[in-house]
Design a protein with these regions (language model features):
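Short intrinsically disordered, low-complexity coil segments enriched in acidic
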Residues: 1-3, 70, 138, 225, ...
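Nucleotide-sugar donor-binding/catalytic module of glycosyltransferases
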Residues: 2-223
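Membrane-interface aromatic/basic loop that binds lipid-linked glycans or pyrophosphate carriers
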Residues: 6, 254-305
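A structural preference for long, well-packed, hydrophobic secondary-structure segments
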Residues: 21-23, 74, 157, 184, ...
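A broadly tuned preference for mixed-charge, low-complexity surface segments
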Residues: 178-183, 239-253, 289-304
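Catalytic core of nucleotide-sugar-dependent glycosyltransferases
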Residues: 202-208, 214-237, 249, 253-267
């Protein structure tokens, strides 16, 4: 009983989990954007994933200066393993993630926490990605509606969302998988009762050309395709064509057997290149679409002569 009381008294409102690995040039911008949000009832968990640069020292420096900062030093295990370590330490009623290449727009967290406080039924709140993803103020009771209406399969990112802690009671990120968010996010959606989006706040995503996903090869894209095919989420024609594009790239780069089942789509849903792809799908099938995609890429390659 005493331990339960202590645990309750030590709980924070918000836990911000930031995996850290080889980001000494962007880490200060990231961490300062979080610490300057004006949320006192917050813990910032910096997970040093065995970073070989100056990041471990930087993390310890923040912990010495700001009591809200907690640091985990661990052997390198990858992004999923680092996030999972942060989840295990987190005591917040709400969880959120920030990648250490990125940063958070001023005054974002206070506004999001106010929304969550006013709507105790919200289990998950998604907010905009600056210059990349605009959202409306909407509430979804059905996972299918949210998944398809917002094209959530295109923004399964862990980071531009606030989660109630209980969603992670039995869910963790898959260690050893690339595109780990695509595996995890559908599980979180199924665990949620109410999902909401807001136009308030902003997450600054800063692409890193050296990241694993930016340098994804055929094996990585095959993993991405598997994540989508195994997620059990509803599929409309637009989502199907998105998967057909991934399947085409996987087939071209690996020669692996086609795993996406054949399907007819409504041509009226598409325009331009997508409409042409839809026509090929309906008339010739998914394998011919893959072959056509490969041929086009070969023709676009510059000649060595």
């Amino acid at each position: 009983m005493i331990l339960q009381i202590i645990s309750y008294l030590c709980r924070m409102l918000l836990s911000v989990i930031i995996p850290v690995y080889r980001v000494e040039h962007t880490l200060q911008r990231c961490v300062e954007s979080v610490l300057s949000q004006g949320v006192d009832d917050m813990e910032v968990i910096l997970v040093d994933d065995g970073s070989p640069d100056n990041c471990p020292v930087l993390c310890d420096g923040w912990a010495e200066k700001d009591a809200r900062v907690k640091v985990i030093h661990k052997d390198n295990g990858g992004l999923s393993d680092a996030r999972n370590a942060g989840i295990e330490m987190a005591t917040g009623d709400y969880l959120t993630f920030v990648d250490s290449d990125d940063y958070v727009k001023d005054d974002t967290y206070p506004a999001l926490l106010q929304i969550m406080a006013e709507h105790p039924d919200y289990d998950l709140l998604e907010y905009p990605i600056v210059n990349r993803l605009s959202l409306e103020d909407r509430t979804y009771q059905q996972t299918q509606e949210y998944w398809l209406d917002t094209k959530a399969y295109l923004h399964t990112y862990a980071w531009n969302k606030i989660y109630r802690r209980h969603l992670f009671d039995d869910i963790r990120f898959p260690v050893g998988k690339i595109f780990e968010d695509v595996y995890t996010f559908p599980q979180l959606l199924r665990a949620a009762t109410t999902i909401a989006t807001t136009q308030i706040g902003g997450y600054h995503y800063c692409p890193n050309p050296q990241s694993i996903t930016a340098q994804a090869d055929g094996a990585a894209l095959s993993m991405l395709l598997d994540a989508h095919l195994q997620n059990g989420m509803p599929m409309d024609d637009i989502y199907y064509l998105h998967l057909a594009n991934i399947q085409s790239d996987v087939w071209e780069r690996t020669g692996q057997p086609i795993r996406l089942a054949a399907r007819q789509v409504d041509i009226a849903h598409f325009h331009g290149k997508d409409k042409l792809k839809a026509i090929i799908l309906n008339t010739l099938g998914i394998k011919k679409l893959c072959q056509t995609n490969k041929l086009i890429h070969l023709l676009k390659k510059p000649s060595r002569w």
